[in-house]
Design a protein with these regions (language model features):
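N-terminal loops that bind phosphate or other acidic moieties
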Residues: 1-164
Length: 164
């Protein structure tokens, strides 16, 4: 995929090194620039920002670092992403001097089919779960309480689907 993107963008490997705007313009997801802009504005107004995600949000952190943002940039992710060697979020966060929080929702031991499936890798991240879990912890909620709430909402969704 990377090679196809480089060919389509007329970039060579490393051709935009040190030039994140060029890399983003040629190969990046436009939402990354939007997220970086929102975050930059929030940080300038002294609004707390937490990036909930993995590699994509670390790309936003990289854009902010290249833009000269020196503030603490917290990134919250799940143990699923932290354990993924292809994502390498811990090393990326360290390279970008981002404050990484990793939370484990404890789905692996769950008897609930959706959570057990998630723990087996049947679902993909992309729902800001790491940020939600980090905020839940800060609010004093246990992961058991979070799992119970997920089961309750999941049950309501399944029940409403079966009524259709």
């Amino acid at each position: 995929i990377v090679e196809e993107g480089l060919a389509a963008s007329a970039l060579e490997r490393g051709g935009a090194a040190g030039e994140p705007k060029v890399a983003l313009r040629r190969m990046g997801d436009p939402v990354l620039a939007t997220a970086a802009g929102f975050a930059h504005g929030a940080l300038e107004s002294d609004t707390a920002v937490t990036f909930a995600g993995g590699t994509q949000l670390l790309a936003v952190v990289a854009l902010l670092r290249h833009a000269g943002v020196e503030a603490t940039l917290p990134v919250a992710t799940t143990s699923f992403l932290a354990a993924d060697p292809s994502a390498n979020v811990e090393a990326l966060a360290a390279d970008l001097d981002a404050a990484l929080t990793v939370t484990d929702p404890g789905f692996a031991g769950s008897s609930h089919s959706a959570m057990a499936g998630y723990a087996r890798g049947e679902a993909k991240e992309g729902v800001a779960m790491g940020g939600v879990l980090a905020l839940a912890e800060r609010a004093g909620l246990s992961m058991a309480q979070v799992r119970q709430a997920i089961e309750t909402v999941y049950g309501r969704l399944i029940d409403s689907e079966s009524e259709r």
